[in-house]
Regions:
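Periplasmic peptidoglycan-binding/tethering modules of Gram-negative envelope proteins
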Residues: 1-51, 59, 63-64, 129-131
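Periplasmic OmpA-like peptidoglycan-binding domain that tethers envelope proteins to the cell wall
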Residues: 55-131
Length: 131
């Protein structure tokens, strides 16, 4: 995902294959290569500082999606925290990482009339804070 991309402060990159189980903050196994690519990027660029952004689709009256694992409306935050916790567990320093959940407030597609559009709204992005 990061091969050949020039990184710049302020840049946001969508982690294309970061898939979670529906209504949960648990990552699906097929997403591990994407997660490992992010880890490899951080290990190769020791000064890289990132912010992890979680997004969900289909929110109605609540600002964030419902997380069945925590019985709370913090799904996007918990998904971003899942990535954060994994990176910390793999030795990336906490000073290089932060995370935020945006719920459904920053949709790529406000019209979520089909599954393709909804799927693109359910995403994890990283923002390059500094190099």
């Amino acid at each position: 995902v990061f091969d050949g991309k020039k990184l710049e402060a302020g840049q946001q990159i969508v982690l294309e294959n970061m898939l979670f189980y529906p209504g949960r903050h648990i990552l699906r196994p097929e997403s591990l290569p994407e997660l490992h690519a992010l880890l490899k990027l951080l290990r190769a660029n020791r000064n890289l500082v990132i912010e992890i952004h979680g997004h969900v689709c289909c929110t109605t009256t609540e600002p964030d999606g419902y997380d069945w694992d925590t019985d709370s409306h913090d799904l996007s935050l918990n998904r971003a925290r899942f990535i954060y916790d994994y990176l910390i567990s793999m030795g990336i320093g906490a000073k290089r990482l932060s995370y935020k959940g945006f719920g459904g407030t920053q949709k790529i597609h406000p019209d979520e009339s089909d599954e393709t559009l909804r799927a693109e709204n359910r995403r994890v992005e990283i923002k390059i804070v500094s190099l």
